[in-house]
UniProtKB/Swiss-Prot annotation:
Mg(2+) 2 binds at residue 272. The lineage of its organism: Eukaryota, Fungi, Dikarya, Basidiomycota, Agaricomycotina. Pfam families: Methyltransf_10. This is Psilocybin synthase. Baeocystin binds at residues 75, 183-184, 187, 203, 281. It comes from Psilocybe cyanescens. The conserved NPPF motif is required for catalysis and represent the basis of substrate specificity toward norbaeocystin. Residue Asn-247 is essential to allow enough space in the active site for multiple methylations while also participating in a network of hydrogen bonds that stabilizes secondary structure elements in the immediate vicinity of the active site for optimal methylation of norbaeocystin.
Length: 309
């Protein structure tokens, strides 16, 4: 986990339940006095996420039973990496630390987890979040209001068949946005969701059920095709955003996206690797500006990734 992630050493479930009593029925004290939560129970997932967001970020979040429930620790990893990227970029460009930062979250979901975390941590950040699912849009907007973020976080509806980087298409000037974030649909269609276990083992654990819909979790061609479209759209929007970023769940997808960046002669890109237990996930960032990130932000130490640079 990221060095600034407060969950690096795990979570004390009992202490968390004391701070968020609704979680108490799902916390078990084991014979060795350790505590555990059965994340195979969807309600336990939702309450655990709500508890962390409430205790550690002061956020009150509604999480529908039939939509994806995000895990806070690995979502925070991504936010912290983006923060690091922006810090290096601001220093290189001579921009003030207290400047207004504006970002985009693609496919924000019902929780709007990324912009919620970002806006709660950084008071000078504002975000536009896109979503195609109407129930997710409605719930995310309620979450924005519940946390008094209307002035800093806008949820906009987009289309499955339309462009992905809609806010950039509507931008009025160069570098109007500092970054994009995205947790793309992982699966290649509903059948892939039924047969693949590749997305398990990260977040709530291998036995935890997925509560998301096909619209949230699947797209034709899977995550690689989705992010590839982002890359192609960025070619015409390059000066409107400093850094384009996205999560990736599969190593194969990472290789495909790096290959596409190279094909378009985009040499300014960075990779991040998240490790949780035996499972690895990745993030990719690319840019058309002259600022190059240091190796500790852009080149994971994993030797299996060395051919990507």
């Amino acid at each position: 986990m990221h060095i600034r992630n407060p969950y690096r050493d795990g979570v004390d479930y009992q202490a968390l339940a004391e701070a968020f009593p609704a979680l108490k029925p799902h916390v078990t004290v084991n014979s060795d006095n350790t505590t555990s939560i059965d994340f195979a129970v969807p309600e336990a997932q939702r309450l655990y996420t709500a508890a962390l967001l409430h205790r550690d970020f002061g956020l009150t979040i509604t999480l529908p039973e039939d939509r994806l429930c995000p895990t806070v620790p690995n979502r925070l990893n991504y936010v912290l990496w983006v923060e690091d990227i922006l810090k290096v970029t601001s220093d290189a460009l001579g921009l003030p630390d207290n400047r207004q930062v504006k970002g985009i979250d693609i496919g924000t979901g019902a929780s709007a987890i990324y912009p919620m975390l970002a806006c709660s941590r950084f008071k000078t950040w504002s975000m536009v979040a896109t979503e195609v699912d109407q129930k997710c849009i409605d719930t995310a907007r309620l979450n924005v209001i519940a946390n008094n973020l209307q002035e800093r976080l806008a949820i906009i509806a987009t289309s499955v068949d339309g462009p992905i980087l809609v806010p950039l298409l509507q931008a009025n000037s160069d570098f109007e946005y500092d970054f994009t974030m995205c947790n793309p649909p992982f699966y290649d269609g509903a059948s892939d969701m039924q047969t693949s276990d590749a997305a398990k083992g990260f977040g709530f654990g291998v036995n935890a059920p997925h509560t998301g819909t096909v619209l949230e979790m699947a797209t034709e061609g899977g995550e690689s095709a989705f992010v590839a479209q982002m890359v192609r759209e960025s070619l015409n929007l390059q000066t409107r955003c400093r850094w384009f970023t996205s999560n990736l769940g599969k190593l194969k997808s990472l290789y495909e996206i790096v290959g596409l960046l190279r094909e378009h002669q985009i040499s300014n890109y960075a990779i991040n690797e998240y490790v949780q237990g035996a499972t690895r996930r990745y993030a990719i960032a690319w840019s058309f500006i002259d600022v190059r990130l240091p190796d500790h932000l852009s080149r994971p130490s994993n030797p299996d990734l060395s051919s990507l640079f």
